[in-house]
């Protein structure tokens, strides 16, 4: 069923179930494997898992479709959509930060600011007003259990209140969170709720304000509510984070009595930030009251208080800073009203405001420094005069006490001149102290007002509202105290939630592994509050306050010295400011500025000013300063705090109490109070720092959740057993659920609980049994409470039934006694009435009193004596009473005197005791301070000794280290020198080697020449010339060869250098091209990803479209079937209607004839005037009905026209959508074919390219081998090659990435075959671009081949040069041998240096490897820790899921049992119904037989009547004879006529009663038949609905199987595609290797590639345009999909409506059964009455026989009437002629009516087509029609009443007509004729009734709306006929005025019966239709 629509205030409390139970979201979640991944913007972002590789996961972001690879530890699970906006986050299946944040964000954006997190509640500040705090909402939450209502602060308050009353344990509600998170507002809501729920004057609230001691009704609650506005005005201010920030902490203690009513309250405050009164930061305000006063004061008040404008006050640093949506003047009036309600007098209010004004005026006092001295002066004392006027002190004394105060020096008192700074400080200190004292006085006054009641408080509920955690730009002493308090509260939360909870599990012996959540805040708390070893911040601050020369800088330095190594302490990074330090709080790092901390801690005041204020003429000011106790400049308010807080415990007070110590003691006391209560935590969260509604900063919220321990609290709530109850209490409370489980007699509580739990069949995982308590998981106790409530209601109902039965029996017995007593009284009265006239009784009554006279006189004397005695006793008693009263008054006076004395003594004793305690406390405190100082001095001495010893050790260590450093430095310098010398020697030797090589070369050349010459000279001197010639030739030749070789060598080197340059250039260009290609590929990949995404979306849309088309086809089939069925029914209905119309026409004809006869008889009796009046009334009614019918027909036709138009529009839209989808499908098929062709072409091109690549690769390998030979000989070439290899490696990685992208693209390309036509055009463009690229690649390959040919030619030249080089190298090798020898020596020399350096490097490498191993191990440890945590979380979630599943299984088993029971009950009920139906059928058969027998008896009676009439005729004839013979008998004629008339009247009345009984019998039979028809129709409808539901279930099952099969086929296709992709990947890897070889050659095509790049960029723009078009198309598809979803939802709603119709039909069937039983009872009573009436009839018929003898005497009077009857016959003939003409016109109208019916039939067929679509929109019109039906029913009832009245008048007229009828002679003849006609009419009536029953049987099968509409149409069609018949009837009445009648009573009564039957039938038909319609409408 659809959810009931939520009201405006419920929208912010309840979750919309339609949003949560969205099947599309569930399907999306399950299909996409959605998870949470970290996000910088949103904290966490939704993504779907695409691929898993070991510990890494590739995910696709849902928002932008971007793919990201992350570690598994960084991913968090996502909950199913049904857990969206869950009210308790402990119910989440996957508990992690992302899920908690998402749930809070969803609820926050829906206006749901409260969320349960296990045992506590999380509140997010909405920054706007929500309508969830009204009295209606309070009533909703009052007394409700937590799980029965959504989360709310009222639920927390109610839980605490009920726990306090039930457990008798003090409760506390702790609102914690940062500043601006909403703590104060929630505190106010708690107080508001308690004031309403726990009010002791409910229903008697009085709004009057009383100032006396007596309470008005509800005054305490009103005062409790008004305390907050007063304290907020004086203690709250606007900060950067919060417009209403509490600048003090408060603990509101509300006391309750035993019955739960509020009996009083008390408020304790902590650390008012009084420095705000004199100075504020930028954009901040001081306390509200200053602005309220200036803005809201009246003119007279401004004059009295000397008020000025905002900008005229120095203490208002920023002037007037307005607060949005708040008016200061209105708030001022509210504050004054609150003060009045609290009982503040007018004088007190003005005094308070005077002090506030004086504080402002203090800031306007200006001091100046005198020229020659530092002394301060006050040149203008106007402000001082105003201050003194307001405070009631002397101006001169005030200025003297400020400028030259008197101070005590030793024993002397001297005046000391103050500097300007000191005077300013004194004024500011005075202003702060004045405001603080005023605030404390107000608090005391409020507490006094709240604690006036004399009732004793049994328990209390505390509400803590303390300033939240604060991090400002400048954080001072107040922020430290506030943050310290929040640390303590958070520690209390952690201790309560985690430590105490688990310790209790261990104490109770429950199996539990202790979990350390790592949330201990004790280190930070100890850093602040630790007294010694080492001292904390507060202790060091107090210590510094002792020293006169101490400064804030020295305090910070000492703090750094003591706590510098603390984990939670850090030095400030700003080196300039030496008064700053940092503390790492749980909520973040806070930098504190310690400026003026010593002053704030000591809080000094000017004694002269305070004494002056103490002596003020203003009583209020003097009271503020009367109890100042000042020692050594430290402000102390001991007396005031003791007197002002009577309920507070008297803490240690005395001298030298600093602000820090006082606050620490207050906080300790508060924490003790909170630990003694049962805390209820409310965690307030600030969503953003801009104070904007509807914005949530995810990281800010996450940080607060982490700090507050929300996740850990939820986890321990889920894993643990948070609900626990003592054995005895469990048994006492829940024994009712397992009544027979515990045997009688004594049994141990634990054993009893075990037996109870077994009887309750609880899952063992849901509870644990401890030593003294039984523990439950969350929700179990709530379930038990629900079952207990149900059981108690059953018991109470049974008890109430017993009580009612007992009372009924008692009342019955009393009635019986009364009845018997009444009978006795009646009997006695009857006897007395008989006796009172009896003479003996009268004598007895007279004599008996005389016998008692003597005894009465004796009794009277005895009574007089007794009366005298009682009077004497009374007088004695009165005298004694007076004496006792005198004694009592004396004793009371003595008692009062003694009480006064005792009171005075007790007061004296109390004062003395108080003084003694105070002195003792001061003494003890001074002693403690002394001991502490001595201990500190000793500790300081020990510490200093230790430090000195450590210092010596450190100095010794420093010396040792310095020596070691010097030695190492010396060794290092030696090594450096040795290294330098070695380097010099090496260089020198290298130079020597070069010189020697040159010399060696020269020497070898010279030696060769000399040897040649010597050999030539020695061998042959003769041939010297020839040899010389040959040598010269050879020399020339060699020289030419060498020169050629040198030239070639230079050329080769130049060419090599040019090649290397070209190579580098090409490499640079190739890298640029690769980058561009990578960018293009990335863009292509993004486009493909977008295409894939669009494909998926399109597939989803197509799938939805197919589902919707199938649903639409099914719906159309059903519509066609229904239409055919409706058309058949309509045809049957029309035939039945035709028959019914004919029958009605005949019926009307008969009625018209009867009416005509009646009018004729009435005309004879001169009743024409009355008839005309009746006719006029009827005509008016007819005209009114006509108008109503016409209006209804017009409205109906208009509605039909509208529905027809809407239906045609809907059909046209659906046809258009179908055509669009068909076109889209055709386009998709076309694009699929084109894509397949393109894919084939691309595959062919890739094969050709791969072949070309292989050829190029072979050539490249050959070249690389040759190049390697060359590069191995040259070191430069080796470096270049290594660089190239690195670049190649990078390119390989890039190519691998490209191939992986290509693989992905190919896998997606396979899916692209099913895509949209718009995307196909884009693909075609991209394919054209690819073809162009391939052509360009072919051009590049051809160019590469040309370059390779050039390279081959160059290579051949190179080979020749290499051979020449080899010859040269052989010569060089001899020289290299000599070089190697010298190098060996050099190596031996440098070996020693290298060994040392290698050792050093080895050590460094070992250190680096160790550090690397350590880092790797640390990283692996962190990773393992993360995985462990993640696995632990998953395990916890799985355990919780397992528990939930077990619970679900148990619940399902229980539901199965209940379902079986219900099924059995339903079977029993159906069998009962079958039995009842059989019994009803049997009864109906019996009644039919009875009716037949009665009909036979009626026929016999009629026959007897005819015989009597015949005998009557004979007797009349005899009477005539007798009359003619005997004339003297006529004297008694008149008397006989009278008696005869009376008898005939009686006979007629009996006949009418008999006829009415017959009519009732007929009506009962009709009702029986109608009920049977209804039953049959209901049964057939029910069977049809069951069959339809079975068909729907079967259809759903088939669809699910089809979907499963489709998913399996898709999975198989996916597997095949993966296999194909893997093969393609391997192939591509091979291709990539081939491509790597072509990289160098591809570099030469750079310029062409740049051109292609430009083309690609232009094409990319085109792609972008196409992409935009595709997005627009996608949006259109999404729009159509959304419309289809809406239509699907509408169809679902219609299905639900049909189910509801079925249920309503079932209810109607039950109602029909009840009506059937009632009809049966009425039929039985009618039968019994009918038998009695038949007996009476027989008796009357005998009497008639006697009277008929007397009728013969009346025939003499008949002759006079015969003439009149003849005239009437003539008039009747004329009327018959007119009737014939009217019948002809009626026939014409009948033909016109049939034509209209045909038109209506066509309209109905169209209307039935539209009914399905218009059904939901027609509810309002249905309601209007129902109202019309009700009005028509009322009209029908009125008409029925009028008919009954008319029937009565007709009966009276019938009686009058009897005299005339008796005188008519021809009555018998006409009676026989009309009797025949009546019999014919009865036969016709029976036929008509049978036809009507059949028509009703058919019509009741049609549903309610159709019946309603058909009924209106029928009425519209019958309107013309009805009008025609009305006219005919009226004419016949006018014309048949004088027609003679022979036997009118039977005919008339029969006619009336016909009319009554007709009207009854019509009414029953209308009732039946209305019942059906109402049944359907209720459905």
UniProtKB/Swiss-Prot annotation:
Keyword Protein transport in the entry? The reply is: no
Q: Which SUPFAM superfamilies does this chain map to?
A: Myosin rod fragments, P-loop containing nucleoside triphosphate hydrolases
Q: Where is this region: Actin-binding?
A: 667-689, 768-782
Which residue spans adopt a coiled-coil conformation according to this UniProt entry? Answer: 850-1979
Q: Which UniProt keywords apply?
A: Actin-binding, ATP-binding, Calmodulin-binding, Coiled coil, Cytoplasm, Methylation, Motor protein, Muscle protein, Myosin, Nucleotide-binding, Thick filament
Q: Which GO terms describe its cellular component?
A: cytoplasm; muscle myosin complex; myofibril; myosin filament; myosin II complex
Question: For this chain's UniProt record, which GO biological process terms are given?
Answer: actomyosin structure organization; cardiac muscle cell development; elastic fiber assembly; myofibril assembly; skeletal muscle myosin thick filament assembly; smooth muscle contraction
Q: What sequence ranges are listed for the domain Myosin motor? A: 84-789
Q: Would you tell me the protein name for this molecule? A: Myosin-11
